[in-house]
């Protein structure tokens, strides 16, 4: 199936074509027709499955085809500023030819720029709960005309203690609305919240990306931030690294790294959302033709890249969303070719590495024989193997379908056995102490 077969309007198809999207992911294929009909949706899907486009594209289309009344018509609530920014960047791409305007608001930064954006008028508001409630209480936001509400990563919202904020938001928005509810997991608390928010929803479940390609050799280098560029230049002296795709978290970081490499006479170009379509296409063509040895990309830009035969992928900065790692390294080793994925990890990125290894269920081999290795990194990596093995073992115990209850039943059984094991150990320890 193609996006054209989903009955999308021409301005959106044009934007998707420029982004490089041709084929919808499973969740997009299932969700877009449902949402275009105006139905509520309950989606069990993780970040990395394409769920942002699954709700953003139909929202943009319905707003484009509406009567264009003023005011905020769609609210997307997210747990973190990083996710809010990422969703905002997606809207930049998909809504570019529609005139549908959006704003992103989150805490931890001054309010003025966000308030100014709201005053200019937006139809879509992407927000974290705290800043949304702050600005609403100050009279900067009115949600009375809201028609669409998206709650993203609901389980993470609960983990972070946002349940009361969500309840406050629900009191501020109209009861008659289309509601989209996404969660990576569906424990009883989430099901209860979903039931209170949704009306006869369509239910969609998408298996998350959790395994990496077999033909890819992975490794991690522990290195401090200020020495990453030196390590990269050291590695690029190896002529076997013929064609390399490097990932950064920010557009500024991509541009800066391209300048560093070009200054060292290593042909490099950056590709990201601030580049014009012609500039992105030129950089991509140069990389495919091997005119340029290094292509540096942000994750948003990389989703539109179709390159099959680069030898190496380098995570210059680890992604803060673990599923993104799987998508990044999946771009090497395509079409039966062996790929090599190298990751740089500074001390502040250790939590990201831990999440990545938990997701893929293995310990990424550490390269220690380089001049910039950090002792802190080696210590943090030590002792993780058994933990990951146990995690993988537990996953196998309760693997099954979430929709028919097998997954949750087996998970509960596994957790019960683990709890009994801990109680037995406690009793033995107590006996020894007595």
What is each stretch, according to the model?
Residues 289, 359, 363-434:
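Basic Arg/Gly/Lys-rich low-complexity intrinsically disordered segments
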Residues 2-377:
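Conserved helicase RecA-like core
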């Amino acid at each position: 199936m193609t996006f054209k077969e989903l009955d999308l309007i021409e301005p959106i198809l044009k934007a998707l074509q420029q982004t490089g999207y041709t084929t919808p992911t499973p969740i997009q294929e299932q969700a877009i027709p449902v949402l275009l009909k105006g139905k509520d949706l309950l989606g069990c899907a993780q970040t990395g499955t394409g769920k942002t486009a699954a709700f953003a594209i139909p929202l943009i289309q319905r707003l484009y085809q509406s009567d264009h009344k003023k005011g905020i018509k769609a609210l997307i609530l997210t747990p973190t500023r990083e996710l809010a920014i990422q969703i905002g960047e997606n809207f930049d791409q998909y809504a570019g030819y529609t005139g549908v305007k959006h704003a992103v608001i989150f805490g931890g930064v001054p309010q003025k720029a966000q308030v100014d954006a709201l005053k200019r008028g937006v139809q879509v508001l992407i927000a974290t709960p705290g800043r949304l409630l702050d600005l609403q209480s100050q009279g900067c936001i009115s949600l009375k005309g809201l028609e669409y509400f998206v709650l993203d990563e609901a389980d993470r919202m609960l983990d972070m203690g946002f349940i009361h904020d969500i309840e406050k938001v629900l009191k501020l928005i109209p009861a008659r609305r289309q509601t989209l509810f996404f969660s990576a997991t569906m424990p009883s608390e989430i099901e209860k919240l979903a039931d209170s928010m949704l009306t006869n929803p369509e239910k969609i479940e998408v298996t998350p990306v959790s395994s990496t390609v077999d033909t890819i050799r992975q490794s991690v280098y522990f290195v401090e931030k200020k020495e990453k560029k030196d390590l990269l230049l050291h590695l690029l002296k190896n002529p076997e690294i013929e064609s390399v795709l490097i990932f950064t978290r920010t557009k500024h970081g991509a541009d800066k790294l391209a300048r560093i490499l070009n200054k060292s006479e290593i042909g490099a170009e950056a590709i990201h959302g601030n580049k014009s379509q012609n500039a992105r296409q030129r950089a991509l063509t140069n990389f495919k033709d091997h005119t340029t040895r290094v292509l540096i990309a942000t994750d948003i830009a990389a989703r539109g890249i179709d390159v099959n035969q680069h030898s190496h992928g380098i995570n210059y900065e680890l992604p803060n969303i673990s599923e993104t790692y799987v998508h990044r390294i999946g771009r090497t080793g395509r079409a039966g070719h062996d790929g090599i994925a190298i990751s740089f990890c500074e001390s502040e990125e250790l939590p990201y590495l831990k999440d990545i290894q938990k997701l893929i269920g293995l310990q990424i081999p550490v390269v220690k024989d380089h001049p910039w290795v950090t002792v802190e990194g080696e210590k943090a990596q030590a002792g993780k193997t058994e933990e990951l093995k146990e995690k993988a073992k537990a996953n196998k115990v309760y693997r099954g379908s979430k929709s028919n209850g097998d997954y949750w039943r087996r998970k509960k059984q596994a957790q019960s056995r683990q709890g009994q094991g801990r109680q037995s150990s406690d009793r033995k320890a107590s006996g020894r102490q007595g």
